[in-house]
């Protein structure tokens, strides 16, 4: 059904972004491929939230936007660690933080999905630090 399709496309968006991770790639390349895949499937990308660097602190620079233009943004370097975690909506991209200051919903109350992985840039590309044992990535098939 429509809700499972949203979940599947969101995972595909994340994987498409992850497939670009390697030294020299730019953050705008990752955001662009995610946005392009979401929008080509008639979904929107949440812009108020993004992936983030991970280091001594949990949420650090750089911000990893899930939309953007290719050839823009910070260039990736070996050793960088960050999340790719697109939030993809059935309706409009705007979201709303509820009074508990934690729960986020879409303003139009349509469904949203999110997938997340933590990525380490290696000299050869990517190591996925949050990989599930049974998970096979599209670029490995």
Q: How should these model regions be labeled?
A:
Residues 1-141:
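Active-site neighborhoods and metal-handling regions in enzymes and metal-associated proteins
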């Amino acid at each position: 059904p429509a809700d499972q399709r949203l979940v599947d496309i969101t995972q595909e968006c994340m994987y498409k972004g992850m497939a670009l991770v390697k030294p020299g790639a730019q953050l705008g390349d990752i955001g662009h491929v995610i946005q392009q895949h979401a929008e080509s499937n008639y979904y929107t990308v949440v812009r108020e939230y993004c992936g983030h660097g991970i280091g001594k602190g949990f949420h650090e620079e750089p911000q990893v936007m899930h939309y953007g233009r290719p050839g823009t943004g910070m260039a990736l370097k070996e050793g960088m660690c960050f999340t790719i975690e697109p939030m993809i909506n059935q309706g409009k991209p705007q979201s709303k933080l509820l009074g508990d200051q934690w729960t986020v919903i879409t303003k139009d109350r349509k469904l949203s999905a999110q997938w997340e992985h933590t990525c380490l840039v290696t000299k050869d590309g990517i190591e996925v630090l949050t990989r599930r044992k049974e998970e096979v990535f599209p670029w490995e098939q």
